[in-house]
Amino acid sequence: MNKKIFNKSGIAIDFGATKISVSQIIKGKFKKTITEPTSINKIANNYIQQIEKNIKNLNISKSKKIGIAITGRVDQYGNWYPVNKENLGNFKIPLKKLIEKKFNTASTIINDATAAALGEANYGKGYQYKRLGYIT
C-alpha cells in the first residue's frame, strides 16, 4: 500500500447531484466536515459560492491543495459537464480554473466514481489484486 497519501493535508470535496461535503484533511485524517444539500439552481457560479461558503464555515484560511470528486464528466483540463441535468443544469464549467483562481491554490478535479475506484485500487482492499472492477 502506498503510505505517502496518509501524510497529506488539504481540502477534500465530494460534490454530488443531491449533496456536497467539504472536509479538512490534516496528515491524512479527516478533521472537520460539513455536508449539506447541493444548491439546485443550475447556475454554475452558485456552485463555486457554495464550496467557498463551506470552506469558510470550516474556518480554513489557506490550503496547499483542493481535491474534488464530482458527479458527471470531467475532461483532461478540469472542465465539468454535469450529467444530472434535472438537478445541476446543462453546461460546461471550467471548474479547475475557477477553483484555482478563487482559492489561489492547486486543485485536482475527478469524476466521483473514478475517484472511488482509484482509491480502492491503490489504498483499499483492491490493492492486493492485479485487476479491479468497481460498480457504483
What do the PLM-derived regions correspond to, one by one?
Residues 5-46, 81-82:
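Short glycine-rich, Thr/Ser-proximal phosphate-binding strand/loop in the N-terminal lobe
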Residues 8-14, 65-67, 131-136:
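Short glycine-aspartate micro-motif
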Residues 18, 71-74:
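Short glycine-rich anion-binding loops that position phosphate/pyrophosphate groups of nucleotides
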Residues 1-9, 56-57, 61:
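Short, Lys/Arg-enriched, disordered terminal segments
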Residues 25, 63-68:
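Short coil-to-beta-strand
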Residues 2-5, 124-128, 135-136:
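Solvent-exposed alpha-helices and their adjacent loops that cap or buttress functional pockets
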Residues 39-52, 64-66, 74-131:
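Glycine-rich phosphate-binding loop and adjoining helix at the ATP-binding site
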